[in-house]
Amino acid sequence: MADSPLEQGWNVVTWALSGSYDEDRPVLIDADQPNRSLSKKQAIDLVARLSGSFQPGSTVCVHLYNDIIYPVLVLAILASHCEWTGTNPAYTSAELSHHFAQSETRYVITDQAYVDVVHQAITASGQNIEIIIFSDIVTDKPGENDLRWRCNKYDLATLHSLLTHGDESTLRRRLQGIPNHSPATAMSTSGTTGLPKMVQRSHRSLVLETGGTQDHNSAKPFQVRRLYCTPIFHAFSFPEMVINTIRLGFPSFYMRRFDESFANKVHEFGITETMAAPAMLLKIIQWTEKHEEQRFKLQGLRTILCAGAALASRLRASFLQLFDDASVRIVQVWGMTEGGWFATFWYPEHDDTGSIGRPLPTCQIRVSEVPHAELPDGRQVGELLVKGPQLLTTYKGHPDATKQAFNDGWLRTGDIGYCANGKVYIIDRAKDIIKVNGWTISPAELEAVLHQMPVIVDAAALSYGTGTKEHVAMFVVAKEPSMLIADIKHHLLQQVARFKVATCEIHLVDSLPRNSSGKILRGVLRHQLQAHYGNGDHGID
């Protein structure tokens, strides 16, 4: 195999299986059942035996939680000359139906627990989609009854029924026929500007990305042992959980989902690195406040990769205070579904300036020539634009949207920020910026100010109203239900210019709606206001 991700002939499967290390050592490990694991050799065997199970050119959807089989399924799908797409197990039938239609799904692999919802979605989509039931091909030896799953109205094939007698030589022959420019994945956008679209990326795109994200592991004074609990189908998690883990060969433990057992697993398995969204860091802090022993169990962590939403400086500082070792790093990752990771920091760099990273080797990042706002220090900020070979090929079935996403070959990210000293800084999302009487206000700035108050657990700021009635609306989660809105507004007036918050309205709530990656769903909050006030032009005292 070639030794560079820039080699033109690479496909994702060849690249993922190209690492050189002890192939009998467990690499993919079930965090709930650590005896259930896969070595590289076992993973290759399963990929070889599953490859060819799907009609070439088809899209195969994996509708499952995190599992050590998931990377194997993705590689087997790609080795079959097919395209992978993944969905959130929490999706409703309506969400699944839309995803199936947009991705042109032909097969869906799912668990028995989700088969009813999947069947409803297929019926609603009107498509001819075959359901394949997840069966544990890691530990279960197939019997005659394991090849089909029969229950009530269902009689469906299982993963066991797909296993053939293929071997590594068969697999290599299949892989030779995969052009590196061919489609590999179809990932769903967040749908913040309409219904979710499918981002189609090529094999070459993913190979370049995962080659660029590789950290300086050999320079680390600790063994890399990863714990994964972020959604594997997400663009933040996918390159590491599916490709780089098996390529680089460090022990990786997969949690089905993030829960309160996190600290116990960090301690039990000697975990040194993990991935998280900011909302997860907040949860961990809250758990340690209730159970001091959880703080002790986290001490082995050395690196936390963080993405999915803006990381407030106060939250970052509070999380780092959990550790006795000052060398613990929270490393931000910035990217989009449209191209994966764009910027991050590599070991051993620390950053306390608020930057979200340095550009990946395959990414060019610049600021739009049209300034969007001005910072207090006079610095002009604008929309961040990205260019490079790892970007999407197209929005599947939406050529016009693809054209609109680019400006002279540069992807419009929708993030407002600036670049300085080789680092990238994000101020806010363009669509979230608030305009009050002609003044530009950043929701992230107001949220950061509120997070300075010890009694504030979570906060969200958004624009509400139109024209001269546009103003700031803030939703606040407080530790003390008796927290006075007047105290919150007083704090804001002490910290920011009066024009930013003089007309703001504040709502105390029990929690904030967030998506699977931790982003605040401002549209849901805005809908709640509309339901209560109408069009928002009700006036503020």
Swiss-Prot record:
Biological process according to GO: secondary metabolic process
Q: Which is an annotated Pfam family here? A: AMP-binding_C
Under Gene3D superfamilies, the record lists:
3.30.300.30, N-terminal domain of ligase-like (3.40.50.12780)
According to its UniProt entry, the function of this protein is described as: Acyl-CoA ligase; part of the gene cluster that mediates the biosynthesis of squalestatin S1 (SQS1, also known as zaragozic acid A), a heavily oxidized fungal polyketide that offers potent cholesterol lowering activity by targeting squalene synthase (SS). SQS1 is composed of a 2,8-dioxobicyclic[3.2.1]octane-3,4,5-tricarboxyclic acid core that is connected to two lipophilic polyketide arms.
Q: Which family does it belong to?
A: Belongs to the ATP-dependent AMP-binding enzyme family.
Source species:
Phoma sp. (strain ATCC 20986 / MF5453)
Entry superkingdom: Eukaryota
Protein's name in the database: Acyl-CoA ligase M9
**What GO MF terms are annotated?**
ATP binding; CoA-ligase activity
Record keyword ATP-binding present: yes
